[in-house]
Amino acid sequence: MSIGILGKKLGMSQLFDEQGRAVPVTLIEAGPCRITQLKNDDTDGYAAVQIGFGETREKLINKPSKGHLTKSGEDLLRHLREYRVDNVDGLELGGSITVSDFEAGQKVDVSGDTMGRGFAGLQKRHGFSRGPMTHGSKNHRQPGSIGAGTTPGRIYPGKRMSGRYGGKKTTTRGLTILRIDSDRNLLVVKGSVPGKPGALLNIKPAVRVGAKPAKGGK
């Protein structure tokens, strides 16, 4: 049973299918993740599994967190995530979640932070068209009008303008696991996932599984 797992993006590569077509893939080093807490309806009001991943220095963990992690036999975990489940039967505190809990062909949703690009203008951030480059125009990359004067006399919230681009959490849904390497804790996922190499990823079984219905269909 696959609940979810944390991993690190290694980079992209490609595989070749039976027809000789190149398939872009992402290599993810996932787990092993330690089960740090089990929640149930009696004590917490809901059932969930908390897992930890990645090492950190002892000086960066405060005493409450260290005491919490010590119960699972590991006190230097950097990242913690919780997954809701129907029940925690068959799971034990201090156990491990590995790539072996997934299977080839399974659909997963991968969450992570997108690449941060810093402060960006309208063309890069929103794909706006540029202004004329010749005939005396000085409006090359400027935004143009951002609102009327007297009425409404302000800029409406949500107006697309320059600002910080990227560095936000996003989820890529419905990716297929093509291969699993249990010896090296690797997941080979078809397509791209958020973030740059080394970024933390959250891999969960897909919420929506199956083909999209035809347009106009049910």
UniProtKB/Swiss-Prot annotation:
SUPFAM superfamilies: Translation proteins
Gene Ontology biological process: translation
InterPro entries: Ribosomal_uL3, Ribosomal_uL3_bac/org-type, Ribosomal_uL3_CS, Transl_B-barrel_sf
Molecular functions (GO terms): rRNA binding; structural constituent of ribosome
Domain of life: Bacteria
This protein's record includes keyword RNA-binding: yes
Keywords carried by this UniProt record: Ribonucleoprotein, Ribosomal protein, RNA-binding, rRNA-binding
Keyword RNA-binding: yes
Subunit structure comment from the entry: Part of the 50S ribosomal subunit. Forms a cluster with proteins L14 and L19.
Family label: Belongs to the universal ribosomal protein uL3 family.
The protein's role, per its UniProt record: One of the primary rRNA binding proteins, it binds directly near the 3'-end of the 23S rRNA, where it nucleates assembly of the 50S subunit.
Name of the protein in its database record: Large ribosomal subunit protein uL3
Biological source species: Synechococcus sp. (strain CC9902)
Upper lineage: Bacteria, Bacillati, Cyanobacteriota, Cyanophyceae, Synechococcales
